[in-house]
Amino acid sequence: MKKEEYWDIYDENKELTGRTMKRNDWNMRPGDYHLTVLGVIRHTNGRYLITKRVMTKSWAPGSWEVSGGGVMAGETSRAAVLREVREETGLDVSDFAGGYLFSYRRDNPEEKDNYFVDIYRFTGDFSESDLHLQEAETDGWKLASVDEIRALAAEGMFLHYDSIRDAFEE
């Protein structure tokens, strides 16, 4: 049986409140937030690793994205992005160049889902044999140029682009 996962609850200033919530419980009070991370992985050849969501996902099946997910209770943002990238792609980016870039905040009071997103970018050398996709999450990958990512975003097929576009700029 899988252990239940919990997220820390933050206030509007991104300070821990000392409270937690069940992962994906979507019943947050106004002014409560959880923390998520996205890891933009740049190959030394200048292209970006993007993955395609499985068609069985309830939200945005078949869309392209960068690795990411929720920060577990007691976990740091950096530890979470390293974990998510490893779980979803098999890559250990802990020794890659780069790190934290910026954060943004989303307020969704109708859905009772308010959150912060910490954006990281890591640059390193890796080969196809280093990639081991998480089958329940991803249905393919590619190394894409910024122009290819922009084109996918223009088609509505690349998630979060408007919020993270600065992570693809040098």
Which role does the model predict for each range below?
Residues 23-27, 102-108:
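Short, solvent-exposed loop/turn elements at beta->coil junctions and helix N-caps
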Residues 2-38, 44:
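Acidic, metal-coordinating catalytic segment for phosphate/diphosphate chemistry
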Residues 36-68:
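A glycine-rich, hydrophobic loop/mini-helix early in the fold
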Residues 61-62, 73, 100-104, 112-170:
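Nudix hydrolase/Nudix homology domain
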Residues 49-50, 66-99:
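The catalytic Nudix box helix
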Residues 13, 43-46, 54, 123-128, ...:
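Short loop segments at secondary-structure junctions
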